[in-house]
C-alpha cells in the first residue's frame, strides 16, 4: 500500500479546500493547452467531499464514539472507497493525457538513444507533473509557467526518489531555469503526495540495439508486469463496493440517529432522576418536619384534653349544685307558702270555733249578775278608755304563743329533708339535662385507637374533639339559660304568690276586725236576750285576738317569708 494515499490525505483535502463536486469531473483540454502546468481542480472535484457526511464543524464526541464502536471494517471500507476514488481520478487524468505523453516519451527516446539503454529505460520512472491540490502545511503550491522548461524536460525530470538518475536534458533544463523556480518546482512536485509515477515499458523485440516502445490503443496502458487496467468504465465490483459503502453509510447514519435519540433519552432520564432525588430529599425533610409537628400536636392534645376535662368537670359540678339549690329553694318556698296558707286557714277556723263554741250558762245568783255587770262595765271602759293591764298581758302572751308557733313551723321546714327527685320545676337528671365528662369516654377511646392505628387522622380527631366540645358547651349554655329562665319564672311566681298572700292577709285582717265586731255585737245581744245562760268553765276564756295580734302575726309571717 502506498503511504502517500492514506485516509488522512482526503480528510486534509476536505478541511483545507472545502470544495465539493461530482465524482469523475472531466478535465477540459484548455488546462493543458500550450504545454502549461496542470491545475489542481480535477482531484479536488474528484475528492471524497461529495460523499462526506454534512456538518459545519468537527464531529461531536458521540459521533466519534459511534464511529469507533462500528468496528474496523467500516474504516477499512471507507479507506478503500477513498483510495478507489483517487485511483479513478488519476486514471481519467492519465487517459486524457495519453496522447500527449506518447509524444513526449517519443521525443525523450529520440534524444536519449546514445546515452541510455533499454534496461535503464525499463527501470526509469517518469513523473507526469500532476500536482495534487493537497499539499503539506507550510509548502506553497507553485504554478509553474510553461516557458520555464520544455515539455521534454518536464517529463523526463525525475525526482530524487526515482529509481534512475536525472537525464542530461533534464539537468540542462534545470540549469537554464532560475534557481528559485527550480527549487519551487522540486519542492512542490517531487514531494507532493498524489503525484503519479508512471513506468514506460520498453522491450527488445529483436536483436537490434533500438528498443521498441509498446503502446496501447489509448484506453489502457501496460503495466511493467503485464497487468492491464480497464479505465473506460466503472467495473461491477467497484459498483458493488459503492453499494456496500452506501448501505454501510445508511446503517451508520441510522445507528447514529438511534444512538443520538438514546443518548438524548438517557440525558433526560438522568435529569429526571436527579430531579426525583431532589424531590425525595425535600419530601424526607418535609416528613421529618411533619413528624415533629405531630409530636407537638400530640403533646398539646394531651394538655388540651386535661384542661377541657377539668373545666368540664367543674362546670358539671357547678351545674349540678346550682340545679340542686334551685330545686331546694323552689321546693322550700312553695312548701313554706303552702304551710303558711294552711296555717292561716287553720287559724281562721280556730278563731271561728273559739268564737262560736263559747258555752253560756244561766246566772243563778246575784253574785253572777254583779260579775256580769262588772264585765260589761269593764268592756265599756275598755272601749272608751283603752285596754287595762291584765288584758294587755293576755294579749302579749297570745302574741308570744303565735310567734313560738311560727318559729316551730319554720324550724320544721328547715329540718325537712328535701328529696332530689322533686319535680317542682320539672328538672330531671336525664341524659338531655345532665351532661358529664363521662359522656366523652367513647369518643376518647375512639380517638386513642385512631391515633394508634393511623397517625395521619390525628388532625381529624382534634377537629372532631373540638367540634364535640363546642357542641357540648353550647348544650350546657342552653341548659343554663333554660335553668335561669325557669328560675326567673319561679321568682316571678313567688313574688306573685307573696303579693297574693299579702292581699289575703290584709283581707284577713279586715275580716278579723269585722268578725270581732260581729262577735262583740252577738255577745252583747246574747247577754241582753238570755241572761239565764252563763259560762260553764270556772276560768275565764282567753280574750279573742285583737288587731295588734293579727298585725304582729302578719309581720312575723312576712319576715319568715323574706
Curated annotation (Swiss-Prot):
Keyword check for Membrane: yes
Superkingdom as given in the UniProt entry: Eukaryota
SUPFAM superfamilies: Intermediate filament protein, coiled coil region
Residue spans of biased composition, Low complexity class: 168-187
Domain IF rod: 73-529
Keyword Nucleus attributed: yes
Residue ranges the record marks as coiled coil: 85-117, 237-301, 458-504
Region called XCCR4 binding. Required for localization to the double-strand breaks (DSBs), residue ranges: 453-528
Listed GO CC annotations: intermediate filament; nuclear inner membrane; nuclear matrix; nucleoplasm
PANTHER family: 1-PYRROLINE-5-CARBOXYLATE DEHYDROGENASE FAMILY MEMBER (PTHR14516), NON-HOMOLOGOUS END JOINING FACTOR IFFO1 (PTHR14516:SF2)
Subunit text: Forms a heterotetramer with XRCC4. The interaction with XRCC4 is direct, involves LIG4-free XRCC4 and leads to relocalization of IFFO1 at the double-strand break (DSB) sites. Interacts with LMNA; the interaction forms an interior nucleoskeleton and the recruitment to DNA double-strand breaks.
Protein name (Swiss-Prot/TrEMBL): Non-homologous end joining factor IFFO1
Gene name linked to the record: Iffo1
Amino acid at each position: 500500500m502506498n503511504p502517500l494515499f492514506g485516509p488522512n490525505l482526503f480528510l486534509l483535502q476536505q478541511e483545507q479546500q472545502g470544495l465539493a463536486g461530482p465524482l469523475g469531473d472531466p478535465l477540459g483540454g484548455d488546462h493543458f493547452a500550450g504545454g502549461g502546468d496542470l491545475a489542481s481542480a480535477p482531484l479536488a472535484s474528484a475528492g471524497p467531499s461529495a460523499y462526506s457526511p454534512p456538518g459545519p464543524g468537527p464531529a461531536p464526541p458521540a459521533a466519534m464514539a459511534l464511529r469507533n464502536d462500528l468496528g474496523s471494517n467500516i474504516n477499512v471500507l471507507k479507506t478503500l472507497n477513498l483510495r478507489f476514488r483517487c485511483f479513478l481520478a488519476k486514471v481519467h487524468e492519465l487517459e486524457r493525457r495519453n496522447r500527449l505523453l506518447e509524444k513526449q516519451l517519443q521525443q525523450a527516446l529520440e534524444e536519449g538513444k546514445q546515452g541510455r539503454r533499454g534496461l535503464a529505460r525499463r527501470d526509469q520512472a517518469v513523473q507526469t507533473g500532476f500536482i495534487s491540490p493537497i499539499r503539506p502545511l507550510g509548502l506553497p503550491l507553485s504554478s509553474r509557467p510553461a516557458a520555464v522548461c520544455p515539455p521534454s524536460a518536464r517529463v523526463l525530470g525525475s525526482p530524487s526518489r526515482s529509481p534512475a538518475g536525472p537525464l542530461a536534458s533534464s539537468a540542462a533544463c534545470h540549469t537554464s531555469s532560475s534557481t528559485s523556480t527550480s527549487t519551487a518546482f522540486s519542492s512542490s512536485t517531487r514531494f507532493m503526495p498524489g503525484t503519479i509515477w508512471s513506468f514506460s515499458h520498453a522491450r527488445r523485440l529483436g536483436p537490434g540495439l533500438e528498443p521498441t516502445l509498446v503502446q496501447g490503443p489509448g484506453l489502457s496502458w501496460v503495466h511493467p508486469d503485464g497487468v492491464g487496467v480497464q479505465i473506460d468504465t466503472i467495473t461491477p465490483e467497484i459498483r458493488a463496493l459503492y453499494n456496500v459503502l452506501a448501505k454501510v453509510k445508511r446503517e451508520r447514519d441510522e445507528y447514529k440517529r438511534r444512538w443520538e435519540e438514546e443518548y438524548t433519552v438517557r440525558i433526560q432520564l438522568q435529569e429526571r432522576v436527579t430531579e426525583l432525588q431532589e424531590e425525595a430529599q425535600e419530601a424526607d425533610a418535609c416528613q421529618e418536619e411533619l413528624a415533629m409537628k405531630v409530636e407537638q400536636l400530640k403533646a398539646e392534645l394531651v394538655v388540651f384534653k386535661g384542661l377541657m376535662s377539668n373545666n368540664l368537670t367543674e362546670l358539671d359540678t357547678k351545674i349540678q349544685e346550682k340545679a340542686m339549690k334551685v330545686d331546694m329553694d323552689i321546693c322550700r318556698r312553695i312548701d313554706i307558702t303552702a304551710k303558711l296558707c294552711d296555717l292561716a286557714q287553720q287559724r281562721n277556723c280556730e278563731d271561728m270555733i273559739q268564737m262560736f263554741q263559747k258555752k253560756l250558762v244561766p246566772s243563778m245568783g246575784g253574785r253572777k249578775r254583779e260579775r256580769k255587770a262588772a264585765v260589761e262595765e269593764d268592756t265599756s271602759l275598755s272601749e272608751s278608755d283603752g285596754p287595762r293591764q291584765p288584758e294587755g298581758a293576755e294579749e302579749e302572751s297570745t302574741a308570744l304563743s303565735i310567734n313560738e308557733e311560727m318559729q316551730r313551723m319554720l324550724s320544721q321546714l328547715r329540718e325537712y329533708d328535701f328529696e332530689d327527685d322533686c319535680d317542682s320545676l320539672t328538672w330531671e337528671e336525664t341524659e338531655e339535662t345532665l351532661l358529664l365528662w363521662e359522656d366523652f369516654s367513647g369518643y376518647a377511646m375512639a380517638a386513642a385507637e385512631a391515633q394508634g392505628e393511623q397517625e395521619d387522622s390525628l388532625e381529624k380527631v382534634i377537629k372532631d374533639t373540638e367540634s364535640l366540645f363546642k357542641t357540648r358547651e353550647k348544650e350546657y349554655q342552653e341548659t343554663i339559660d333554660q335553668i335561669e329562665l325557669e328560675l326567673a319564672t319561679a321568682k316571678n311566681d313567688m313574688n306573685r304568690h307573696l303579693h297574693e298572700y299579702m292581699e289575703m292577709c290584709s283581707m284577713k285582717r279586715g275580716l278579723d276586725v269585722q268578725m270581732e265586731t260581729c262577735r262583740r255585737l252577738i255577745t252583747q245581744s246574747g247577754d241582753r236576750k238570755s241572761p239565764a245562760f252563763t259560762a260553764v268553765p270556772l276560768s275565764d276564756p282567753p280574750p279573742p285576738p285583737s288587731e295588734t295580734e293579727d298585725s304582729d302575726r302578719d309581720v312575723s309571717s312576712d319576715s319568715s317569708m323574706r
